[in-house]
C-alpha cells in the first residue's frame, strides 16, 4: 500500500519529500497518509493541504508508537505519544 493508492485524491504536488528511513504505512481507514520509521517507531502523519482531516492538529504531526509486536512490528493501537506538530514542513525536518 502507498499513500497514492490509499488516498488517490491526495495531491502529489502537496506531498513533501519524506526523510530517509520512513516507510509508507498509509491505509485508507486512517485520516491521511502516514509514514513510520521502523528503527524508532516514529510516525509521521501528513494531512491534506486544505480541509485537513486531522482535527485540532497541524498539517504535519509526529508521534511515537508505544506498542511493538515481534511478528508485525510497530502497532498504532496501544497508544501513540505526541512528539511534535507544525504546519511548517521545515520545522518537522529540522
Regions found by a protein language model. Name each.
Residues 1-40:
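Negatively charged, low-complexity tracts enriched in Asp/Glu with abundant Ser/Thr
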Residues 1-3, 90-94:
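Short intrinsically disordered terminal tails
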Residues 41-86:
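Intrinsically disordered, low-complexity regulatory segments enriched in Ser/Thr/Pro
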Residues 10-13, 83, 87:
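Low-complexity, intrinsically disordered/propeptide-like segments
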Amino acid at each position: 500500500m502507498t499513500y497514492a493508492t490509499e488516498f488517490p485524491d491526495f495531491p502529489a504536488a502537496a506531498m513533501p519529500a519524506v526523510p530517509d528511513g520512513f516507510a509508507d504505512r498509509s491505509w485508507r481507514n486512517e485520516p491521511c497518509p502516514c509514514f513510520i520509521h521502523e528503527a524508532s517507531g516514529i510516525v509521521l502523519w501528513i494531512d491534506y493541504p486544505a480541509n485537513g482531516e486531522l482535527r485540532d492538529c497541524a498539517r504535519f504531526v509526529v508521534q511515537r508508537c508505544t506498542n511493538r509486536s515481534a511478528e508485525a512490528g510497530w502497532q498504532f493501537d496501544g497508544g501513540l505519544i505526541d512528539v511534535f506538530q507544525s504546519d511548517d514542513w521545515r520545522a518537522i525536518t529540522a
